[in-house]
Amino acid sequence: MSRKAYLILENGTVFEGKSFGAEKETMGELVFTTAMTGYLETLTDPSYFGQVVIQTFPLIGNYGVIPSDFESKVPSLRGYIVREWCQAPSNFRCEGDLDTFLKESDIPGIYGLDTRALTRIVREYGVLNCKIAYSGEVTEEELAEIKAYKIEQAVESTTISEKEEFKAENGDLNVVLMDFGAKHNIGCLLYTSPSPRDSTSSR
């Protein structure tokens, strides 16, 4: 049976759901995506570094985990919020389920809460800081800590450590990309370079 989990917003609002993925408390900026497909791309998109992401589409995980769909090698987000996750994924490329992937990536998730009501709050008030916790009781000190959260060292945490080459089947252009947290879906012969670099080091 899944453990109860709570999403605490910086304005004091608390949503109750159930835990999946890694069981750990975490804080982040609360954002949402309305994408109906591509949850693996969302999970591995470096632009979500430091954020807790809400999926508004009600069922997530139905085609499992497919590494070739990843936008980066590992997830950069801090937490993952869904209405329901599929416990029996089906796809000929599937290599695992969402719960196991989140556990292995040390990403906590919550399911079973009203993601659309939560999204309306974000739309009305803008980006809010939040905390994934396992107690619904909130102290003033805890709220102050949530409000003070800031995303730091995003580039340093998402850039690569050494140069890489990505080959495109039909690419006839060569591009050097300075990696400040780049995504993998680019249709050229691509060389990535760690950040920061001067112009001569990319040659």
Region annotations inferred by a language model:
Residues 191-203:
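Single conserved hydrophobic/aromatic residue that forms the stacking wall/gate
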